[in-house]
């Protein structure tokens, strides 16, 4: 398949093919079997542990078993040949991420959970040999966990150029000061590494080259975990934490990439991670739709099954159509990420899928809750938790408005490059009087 640039977009010579490869089919079969035999039976126990605010101890045993089965690091196309696990392309991994999404903790079993997956992707891309040995190797092995500290409570973090946490260079040392929050994963007892985005003390006027990413040991002097922040009253065992950095000193060798490259590194981290998030979200929507269909078939009201009520049929049909639309959009982005020459509109694609998936989840789950009635509000089904998570997703990893802005800017940029392209489609009086000529 050949890919050529055309008017700011990408012209596909040949075709996009989203059919699952035989390799993806085989690994999906193995994953589904593992989920059914080993993970789903522990789901109630996991929720019991989560309700107590602690990680479930048995997850470590499941992780060891998954690694033995090769169901490990599946989300990393660039996985080194000597690293544990199985490398899959973004497109091949997408259906596996969807299957994992049905349980909030399944991705963790396979070492494919955020933020570790994105952090490993970033370290594979930009870490020095020493950083790879100290941080990447144990992350790939699953012996440590990590977190990514970007958002801040004192600025509008939806614009990352606002970030105020500061890093300065003192000889061969980096000194970090600032406050971060919603640092996912930082409360996990095995979290050893914080990737911290901070503004350079010597930053110039170029806002997009004013920040750097520093690798900070979680137990470094001056790092204070202030609290694990509940998200809509739910306290995640792994944490969405507020952290204060006071005169935290690390060797200059813990700078990731180049000085001032933090913004570009953070952007590069987002693409694969959003495909993973969105496919897991689609898996959750499939779960919600499946539960709603079962409920509609077995529940009766006003003398007939809910499945025969016209409005319920509309809800189910709308959900099926919207899920399939969203899946195709995400698969296109996964395919684009796999191309040797990424399409010119890849950034807009990534923004679009994040927006679509988060909104989709709220709509599909809301309909399912309506089918279930009071039970849909209870903890007896996963629906209330899924709805809550869908609402959080519309802010986490960038609010809807930022993604809409990205898509609109790309569209307007292309329109500006093609001014006048659509003028002949007007039917003004002058055009109506014009005499068309074939020759």
Where are these regions (language model features)?
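N-terminal amphipathic/basic-hydrophobic helices that include classical n-h-c signal peptides
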Residues: 1-15
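Alpha-helical interface subdomain recognition
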Residues: 13-104, 113, 126-131, 138, ...
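Short glycine/proline-enriched turns and hinge-like loops at secondary-structure junctions
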Residues: 87-88, 158-161, 186-191, 206-210, ...
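N-terminal glycine-rich flavin-associated loop
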Residues: 108-130, 159
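A short, Trp-centered hydrophobic/proline-enriched beta-strand micro-motif
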Residues: 142-151, 196
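Flexible, small-/acidic-enriched active-site or ligand-binding loops
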Residues: 162, 221-249
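A short core secondary-structure module
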Residues: 173, 177-225
């Amino acid at each position: 398949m050949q890919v050529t640039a055309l008017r700011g977009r990408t012209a596909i010579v040949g075709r996009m093919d989203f059919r699952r490869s035989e390799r993806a089919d085989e690994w999906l079969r193995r994953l589904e079997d593992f989920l059914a035999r080993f993970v789903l039976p522990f789901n109630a126990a996991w929720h019991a542990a989560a309700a107590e605010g602690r990680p479930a101890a048995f997850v470590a045993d499941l992780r060891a078993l998954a690694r033995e089965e090769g169901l490990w690091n599946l989300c990393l196309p660039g996985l080194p040949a000597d690293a544990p696990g199985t490398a899959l392309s973004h497109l091949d991994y997408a259906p596996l991420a969807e299957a994992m999404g049905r349980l909030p903790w399944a991705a963790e079993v396979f070492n494919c959970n955020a933020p570790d997956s994105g952090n490993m992707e970033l370290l594979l891309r930009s870490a020095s040999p020493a950083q790879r040995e100290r941080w990447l190797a144990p992350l790939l092995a699953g012996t440590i966990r990590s977190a990514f500290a970007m958002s801040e409570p004192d600025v509008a973090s939806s614009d990352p150029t606002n970030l105020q946490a500061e890093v300065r260079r003192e000889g061969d040392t980096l000194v970090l000061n600032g406050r971060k929050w919603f640092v996912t994963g930082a409360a996990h007892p095995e979290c050893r590494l914080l990737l911290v985005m901070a503004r350079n003390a010597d930053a110039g006027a170029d806002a997009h080259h004013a920040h750097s990413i520093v690798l900070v040991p979680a137990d470094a002097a001056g790092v204070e975990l202030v609290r694990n922040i509940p998200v809509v009253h739910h306290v995640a065992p792994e944490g969405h934490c507020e952290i204060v950095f006071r005169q935290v000193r690390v060797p200059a060798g813990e700078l990731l990439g180049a000085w001032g490259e933090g913004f570009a590194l953070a952007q590069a981290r987002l693409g694969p991670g959003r495909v993973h998030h969105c496919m897991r979200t689609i898996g959750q929507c499939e779960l919600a739709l499946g539960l709603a269909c079962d409920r509609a078939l077995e529940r009766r009201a006003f003398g007939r099954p809910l499945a025969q009520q016209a409005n319920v049929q509309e809800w189910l049909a709308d959900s099926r159509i919207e899920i399939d639309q969203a899946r195709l959009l995400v698969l296109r982005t996964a395919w684009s990420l796999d191309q040797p020459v990424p399409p010119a509109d890849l950034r807009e694609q990534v923004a679009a899928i994040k927006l679509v998936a988060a909104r989709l989840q709220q709509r599909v789950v809301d309909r399912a809750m309506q089918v279930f009635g009071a039970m849909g509000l209870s903890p007896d089904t996963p629906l209330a938790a899924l709805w809550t998570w869908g609402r959080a997703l519309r802010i986490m990893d960038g609010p809807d408005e930022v993604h809409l802005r990205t898509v609109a800017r790309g569209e307007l940029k292309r329109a500006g490059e093609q001014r006048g392209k659509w003028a002949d489609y007007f039917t003004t009086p002058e055009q109506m009087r014009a005499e068309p000529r074939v020759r």
